[in-house]
A protein has these predicted regions:
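Short alpha-helical donor nucleotide-sugar binding micro-motif in glycosyltransferases
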Residues: 271-272, 279-284
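Aromatic "clamp/platform" in nucleotide-sugar-dependent glycosyltransferases that forms part
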Residues: 292
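Short hydrophobic beta-strand element within catalytic cores of glycosyltransferases
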Residues: 309-312
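Conserved acidic donor-binding segment of nucleotide-sugar-dependent glycosyltransferases
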Residues: 324-325, 329-336, 345-350
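Carbohydrate-associated surface elements
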Residues: 41, 163, 185
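Nucleotide-activated donor-binding/catalytic signature segment of Leloir-type glycosyltransferases, i.e.
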Residues: 253-272
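N-terminal subdomain of nucleotide-sugar transferases
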Residues: 1-53, 393, 398-412
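Conserved donor-binding/catalytic core segment of Leloir-type glycosyltransferases
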Residues: 4, 201-228, 241
Length: 412
């Protein structure tokens, strides 16, 4: 099958979308499919600092095309970049026709694939993966209509869990029957500890708390720092690391300084090449993800695969894989005293920490394999490959210049 995969964000940008794309591409190539990936990327200094930027690297067995987000990074002009994506897909289709167009993220990439599918007569698949389900479309009428058209007219919609389906349908009025639930997945071998039981090796010193991913207040990084201040005040020993880049690196460092944390007390380690990420997990005992919402958290799955106990939140995209007291500890998003309480429990109770880590590791190995998820996605391709794309929608979107993402497109 000839597959076009259109990515909103791929390496060197560090994102759950990058990880998802890398693993799916590997599964598609391994199954013998002919795959082309077109990926957007930031080429400007600001975008590179926030997410990591530059053209996508080669991917074994995949034709890779990078498209710089010239519209977004200069003036928040999503429409310019959408037109560029549609033109690139059409050129590749003319060279060798596609059977499936698959977009990662509902807007702008999902809208671009919907337009290209209509133009070329090829069925479309769209993965709803994060902010596209949480806030894109609540920002302005332009993006609301675009998201609603994608959700109504793509040949197939993939989404990580039932809680995310509920949120998207409540917010945008979609039909839940339109969605196919495809959970997140992780390469369990790659993130394995290498110990006999799969858990972190014993070590001297305090329990090591680890935050990894986008450094973003929406991911709870500022709440984590505030909770650590409570732990310190009550005399609970810990070591803490915050790994990654994102829009709130500077505010996070400023808050840590304001709370009088030394650079040794909270280590900010910055950008991490994806190849080095498993070793970061191996230097921790507890993964902390006080997120407000996810599509399906790749980092939580990575932490489970690495045998770490997990502290997170009762949030969309988390509740589909973690259950409080069974394979993790969960608190309400934004409840800093409760977060501090959960961290205190997991730091001071060795048996609890081990029980949660063992349960998470066992479930991760049993449920969240990329081979199973890849087969499920390829099954969706087979189901829709002979369908006609929808044409009963307008290609013209209403103009709404009030959208907050015009000024801060990197947050979309």
């Amino acid at each position: 099958m000839r597959i076009l995969f259109l990515s909103r964000r791929y390496f060197p940008a560090i994102s759950g979308m990058s990880v998802y794309a890398q693993n799916l591409l590997r599964e598609l190539v391994g199954a013998g499919h002919d795959v082309t990936m077109i990926s957007q990327y930031r080429g400007d200094a600001f975008g590179t600092r926030v997410y990591g930027g530059g053209p996508p690297p080669p991917v074994p067995g995949v034709r890779v095309i990078g498209l710089e987000q010239l519209g977004e990074q200069t003036s928040g002009d999503f429409e310019r970049d959408i037109a560029t994506m549609v033109d690139a897909i059409a050129r590749e289709h003319a060279r060798n026709p596609f059977d499936i167009l698959h977009a990662q993220y509902g807007y702008p990439t999902g809208w671009a694939v919907l337009l290209a599918a209509r133009k070329l007569g090829v069925p479309s698949v769209v993965s709803i993966q994060g902010g596209d389900g949480h806030w894109v479309g609540s920002c302005c009428e332009t993006h609301r209509v675009a998201m609603c058209e994608v959700l109504a007219h793509a040949n197939a919609l993939l989404i990580g869990g039932a809680s995310f389906v509920d949120e998207v349908c409540e917010r945008l009025g979609s039909d839940p029957a339109r969605f196919t639930i495809v959970p997140g997945a992780v390469d369990t071998d790659r993130f394995a500890q290498g110990t006999s039981d799969g858990l972190p090796a014993p070590h001297d010193g305090p329990v090591r708390l680890f935050y990894h991913g986008r450094v973003d207040r929406r991911k709870g990084v500022l709440d984590f720092i505030e909770a650590l201040a409570i732990l310190r005040a009550q005399g609970t020993p810990f070591a803490a690391t915050i790994s990654g880049i994102g829009p709130d690196v500077d505010p996070a460092k400023a808050l840590a300084a304001e709370r009088a944390f030394s650079e040794r007390a909270i280590a900010f380690t910055g950008y991490a090449e994806y190849g080095s990420v498993p070793d970061l997990y191996r230097r921790a005992d507890v993964f902390v993800s006080p997120t407000y919402a996810e599509g399906f958290s790749n980092t939580i799955l990575e932490a489970m695969a690495a045998g770490l106990a997990v502290v997170s939140c009762h949030a969309v995209g988390v509740s589909d894989c973690l259950r409080d007291g069974e394979n993790g500890l969960l608190v309400n998003p934004g409840d800093i005293p409760a977060l501090a309480g959960a961290l205190t429990r997991i730091v001071t109770d060795t048996a609890l920490r081990r029980d949660l880590a063992e349960a998470g590791l066992e479930e991760c190995r049993r449920v969240y394999s990329w081979s199973a998820v890849g087969r499920q996605i390829m099954g969706v391709y087979e189901r829709v490959r002979h369908e006609r794309p929808a044409t009963d929608f307008s290609v013209d979107l209403p103009e709404d210049p009030t959208c907050r993402f015009r000024a801060e497109p990197h947050l979309l």
